[in-house]
């Protein structure tokens, strides 16, 4: 691998400078403007901490932060508790229909938070199909609203991420380690907790960070089913909307608090991961085996049950999309009426929903490949800057990034708020870190030989 410690103004040097310029315009400038607004008195133009004092002195606002921590920590713990054992079962046992189950688990994590929350309202809302079923049997079950519902929806959407991370890490464990543990009398559940979990702990910490960040920044789920249980992103959005046309300082201060919190969580995770980091060399990967009769039935039951519950919202939404409706009420019969209505009334919105992500996807892939090449093959002081800049959006909640872009580009000469450009830019900046991580860890290895 080349080790170019000095910057050279060639083609790759120009690309490096251009990449830094793009980050400076669409990331650093909005974030700096956001921080400026959070400490600027709109009347006098002087420095002030009044907005931060307001947030921490009023229990209404401060409690939303506590609520978000409760939700995020609980969802993270449950996601780890579900995703890790599930990945272990998939790795060591032969399970019928495993390829289909793998696809379904990925699909379960793909729906937007709004869709997931809406789906569970149809199932466990006050008039949901499951709620009504048990009500007819004379059994009262908790509805989906409030803390429990938020945690349920987030967990079922996010445990697949832990599953994918853990499953990848389990492939790197040498089977001889597990065999040695079994020869010493450590097998089954004991082997899982004493041998397997410590070996994949760095990966689990990375997955936990991702789940925590996602759940902490989730706006759609608590907005739809939180009711009286208000979380940090909901209050941030509400305050920003209330301040549109006026001073946006308080919303900016809340956004800065979110950045500080997620940054601290990220740094703690990195510190703990580095303390527990070690290399795994899988000379003899774990081989799938048939479980004993009784265990085999239990394994299949657990796997099918977890995957079935996770995919249930998506399956039910697809099913109801074909049902006939009268207004907001489902009636007997099936047709494509709902699709015709949606395309007729929301054709332009559907078109934008397809075009904007596609444009962002093309740019993300191109930038990720370039950044991976620069970081791996053309490493110098400036490419290190590119590497750091590309990771900043990883720790910035999506709501915060959106507000920063709206505040930063809401006045001439950089007036692009309300345009397709700012939506594409937001998606690129927000999702680029995940693609960069992929390319710099895996695809970059191939670039080394170029």
Model-flagged regions — what are they?
Residues 6-12, 52-60, 216, 222-263, ...:
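Interhelical loop and adjacent transmembrane-helix boundary motif
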Residues 11-42, 58-171, 199-219, 253-269, ...:
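Membrane-water interface segments at the C-terminal ends of transmembrane alpha-helices
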Residues 40-48, 125-136, 227-234, 276-283, ...:
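Peri-membrane helix termini and adjoining interfacial loops of integral membrane proteins
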Residues 94-96, 171-176, 186-188, 227-230, ...:
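Juxtamembrane helix-boundary/capping and inter-helix hinge elements in multi-pass membrane proteins
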Residues 267-302:
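Alpha-helical transmembrane segments of integral membrane proteins
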């Amino acid at each position: 691998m080349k080790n170019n410690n000095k910057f050279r103004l060639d083609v790759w040097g120009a690309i490096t400078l251009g990449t830094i310029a793009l980050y400076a315009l669409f990331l650093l400038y909005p974030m700096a403007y956001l921080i400026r607004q959070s400490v600027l008195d709109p009347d006098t133009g002087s420095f002030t901490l009044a907005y931060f004092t307001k947030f921490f002195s009023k229990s209404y606002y401060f409690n939303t932060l506590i609520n978000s921590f409760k939700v995020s920590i609980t969802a993270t713990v449950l996601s780890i508790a579900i995703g890790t054992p599930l990945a272990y079962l998939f790795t060591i046992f032969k399970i019928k229909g495993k390829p289909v189950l793998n696809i379904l688990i990925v699909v379960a994590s793909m729906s937007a938070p709004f869709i997931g929350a809406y789906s569970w309202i149809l199932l466990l809302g006050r008039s949901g199909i499951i709620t009504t079923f048990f009500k007819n049997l004379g059994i009262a079950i908790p509805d989906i609203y409030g803390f429990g519902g938020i945690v349920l929806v987030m967990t079922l959407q996010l445990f697949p991420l832990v599953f994918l991370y853990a499953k990848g890490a389990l492939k790197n464990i040498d089977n001889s380690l597990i065999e040695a543990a079994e020869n010493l009398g450590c097998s089954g559940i004991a082997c899982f907790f004493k041998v397997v979990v410590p070996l994949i702990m760095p990966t689990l910490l990375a997955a936990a960070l991702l789940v925590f960040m996602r759940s902490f920044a989730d706006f759609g789920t608590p907005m739809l089913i939180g009711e009286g249980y208000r979380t940090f992103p909901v209050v941030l959005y509400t305050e920003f909307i209330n301040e549109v046309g006026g001073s946006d300082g308080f919303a900016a201060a809340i956004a800065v608090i979110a950045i500080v919190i997620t940054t601290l969580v990220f740094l703690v995770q990195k510190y703990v991961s580095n303390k527990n980091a070690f290399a795994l060399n899988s000379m003899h990967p774990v081989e799938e085996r048939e479980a004993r009769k009784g265990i085999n039935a239990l394994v299949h039951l657990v796997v099918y049950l977890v995957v079935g519950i996770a995919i249930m919202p998506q399956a039910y939404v697809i099913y109801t999309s074909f049902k006939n409706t009268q207004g907001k009420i489902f009636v007997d019969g099936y047709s494509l009426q709902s699709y015709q209505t949606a395309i007729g009334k929301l054709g332009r919105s559907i078109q934008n929903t397809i075009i904007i992500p596609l444009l962002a996807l093309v740019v993300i892939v191109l930038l990720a490949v370039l950044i991976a090449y620069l970081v791996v093959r053309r490493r110098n002081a400036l490419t290190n800057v590119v590497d750091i800049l590309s990771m900043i959006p990883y720790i910035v909640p999506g709501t915060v990034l959106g507000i920063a872009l709206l505040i930063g580009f809401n006045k001439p000469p950089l007036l692009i708020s309300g345009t397709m450009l700012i939506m594409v830019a937001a998606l690129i900046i927000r999702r680029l870190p995940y693609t960069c991580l992929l390319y710099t860890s895996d695809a970059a290895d191939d670039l080394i030989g170029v």
